[in-house]
């Protein structure tokens, strides 16, 4: 039995607007979920990527999204679409990862002249859909990935763990919770990030030539 969402507001709601459903997006199963005026799609077999987040009231497409993208396009370039979740993000020089009890040699996937391991592997794996549901306050999708010797990356990082993801849509927007559980007797390195890709233009029907980017400069070098 799942817990109910705990958001509350004086805003009038239509219960029929809150839903979750399994559907397909260009060759991959997704959970479409909607609540609080937002609609999103969780592609659990594409690394639990939230490949779309849309503000239905204001016509805003938050993440980089292309309705014609195939699953293979997203899978091959998962870091540049939607909201991918990265375990071991950023760069490890020469692929070397040191913990308090071991030194691991990760595969170098950013070649010369950089010679780094970059962004890990979790965003490229097929995750498992645990559950999805909606109530009068929100819509929730839960997924997980179990990392063990069946993963080809295990030869480089032999530390069993589970990664659990909870995505909640409400009038507050999208909430993203992540839980890692170390299933080994070794020290597990923890480094996690979302590689958020922002859509341009934001607004449905917007034009790129109308976009202005303002970056505050506090110090001139």
What are these regions (language model features)?
Residues 16-175, 179, 183-221:
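Surface-exposed acidic/polar loop and edge beta-strand patches at domain peripheries
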Residues 3-16:
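Short, Lys/Arg-enriched N-terminal segments with co-localized hydrophobic residues
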């Amino acid at each position: 039995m799942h817990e109910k969402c705990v958001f509350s507001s004086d805003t009038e709601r239509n219960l029929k607007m809150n839903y979750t459903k399994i559907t397909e997006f260009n060759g991959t199963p997704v959970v479409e979920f909607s609540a609080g005026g937002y609609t999103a799609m969780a592609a659990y077999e594409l690394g639990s990527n939230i490949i779309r987040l849309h503000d239905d009231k204001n016509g805003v497409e938050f993440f980089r999204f292309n309705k014609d993208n195939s699953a293979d396009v997203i899978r091959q370039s998962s870091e540049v679409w939607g909201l991918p979740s990265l375990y071991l993000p950023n760069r490890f020089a020469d692929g070397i990862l040191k913990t308090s009890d071991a030194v691991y040699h990760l595969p170098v996937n950013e070649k010369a002249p950089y010679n780094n391991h970059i962004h890990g592997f979790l965003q490229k794996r097929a995750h498992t859909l645990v559950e999805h549901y909606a109530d009068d306050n929100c819509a929730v999708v839960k997924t997980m990935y179990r990392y063990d010797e069946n993963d080809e990356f295990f030869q480089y990082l032999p530390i069993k763990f589970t990664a659990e993801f909870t995505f909640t849509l409400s009038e507050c927007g999208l909430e993203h919770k992540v839980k890692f559980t170390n299933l080994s007797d070794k020290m597990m390195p923890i480094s996690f990030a979302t590689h958020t890709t922002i859509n341009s233009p934001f607004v449905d029907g917007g034009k790129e030539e109308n976009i202005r980017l303002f970056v505050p400069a506090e110090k001139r070098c």
